[in-house]
């Protein structure tokens, strides 16, 4: 564990002295962990009461100290920490989006009342370089249905060519799906930024499909709170597509609708019905 240097410790009932820490390398959007050794340097015990009482948490700040994520997940103490007692705690840490330079500020919070920093204690602030979620930009493909020459031609024009070996993300298309040239780049950009699932906009050829798929029409921008399943999604390892409106889909969390990643869709002729 890395030793923490000297820092101000107030006199009073609520005070913390940080002794040491160990931090797993954060990646954008990925749940990691940290181990902290800290001392109750005040005169009052710390007691966690389920989700209330004294909890360990953190803020993600930008390099200037502005809050990017104010409320990190809470970690309760398994038992009361008495004045003068030193404990080690393992805490979950969720990497912020997008990757980049941040400051990770650990603090204690008296839930629904105040952070210890607000009553004079110093948080443990660490400079952190958050890495992209994916270590390599390698996009593979699963084609649902029969091979299609026009789809194959569109894939051959991609700004970032698709790979067959060791992909880190896999996109799901159907025959007659014609991605725009920047489609693969935009999917990989979003995965790097921290999303496990990314789906683009659908631009159908037929009027019937345009009405049916109006919620996925181009022009919607980027939306991490999209109210519909992603269609023709790109998924990181371990995620599998389902089916919605006869197309491969994904309806889980940790997902982004990328309205600039456009896939033109021929009429249903030659595609699986569903």
Please place each PLM-identified region on the residue numbering.
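Low-complexity, acidic Ser/Thr/Pro/Gly-rich terminal tails and inter-domain linkers that flank the onset
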Residues: 2-28, 125
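Short beta-strand and strand-turn-strand segments in soluble, beta-rich domains
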Residues: 15-18, 53, 57-77, 120
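Asparagine-centered strand-capping/turn motif at beta-strand->loop junctions
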Residues: 38-44
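Short, surface-exposed loop/turn segments at beta-strand-coil junctions that are enriched for proline
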Residues: 94-100
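N-proximal low-complexity "stem/linker" segments adjacent to membrane-targeting elements
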Residues: 131-157
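Short beta-strand-to-loop acidic/aromatic patch adjacent to the donor-nucleotide binding site
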Residues: 165-180
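Conserved donor NDP-sugar-binding/catalytic core segment of glycosyltransferases
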Residues: 178-213
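A recurrent flexible, glycine/aromatic-enriched loop bordering the glycosyltransferase active site
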Residues: 216-238, 243-259, 263-272
């Amino acid at each position: 564990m890395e030793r923490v240097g000297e820092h101000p410790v107030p006199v009073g009932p609520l005070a913390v002295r940080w002794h040491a820490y160990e931090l797993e390398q954060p990646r954008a959007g990925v749940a990691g962990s940290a181990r902290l050794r800290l001392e109750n340097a005040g005169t009052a015990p710390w007691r966690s009461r389920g989700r209330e009482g004294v909890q360990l948490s953190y803020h993600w700040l930008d390099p200037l100290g502005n809050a990017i994520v104010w409320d990190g997940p809470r970690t309760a103490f398994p038992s009361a920490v008495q004045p003068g007692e030193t404990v080690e705690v393992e805490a979950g840490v969720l990497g912020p989006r997008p990757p980049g330079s941040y400051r990770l500020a650990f603090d204690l919070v008296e839930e629904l009342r105040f952070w210890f920093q607000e009553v004079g204690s110093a948080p443990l602030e660490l400079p952190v370089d958050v890495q992209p979620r994916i270590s390599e930009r390698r996009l593979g493909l699963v084609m649902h249905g029969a091979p299609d020459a026009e789809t194959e031609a569109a894939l051959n024009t991609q700004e970032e060519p698709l790979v067959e070996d060791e992909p880190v993300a896999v996109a799901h298309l159907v025959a007659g799906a014609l991605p725009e040239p920047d489609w693969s780049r935009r999917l990989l950009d979003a995965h790097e930024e921290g999303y496990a699932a990314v789906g683009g906009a659908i631009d159908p050829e037929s009027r019937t499909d345009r009405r049916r798929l109006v919620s996925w029409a181009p022009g919607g921008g980027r939306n991490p709170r999209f109210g519909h399943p992603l269609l023709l999604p790109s998924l990181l390892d371990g995620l599998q597509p389902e089916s919605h409106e006869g197309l491969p889909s994904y309806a889980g969390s940790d997902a982004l609708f990328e309205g600039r990643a456009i896939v033109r869709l021929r009429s249903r002729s030659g595609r699986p019905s569903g």
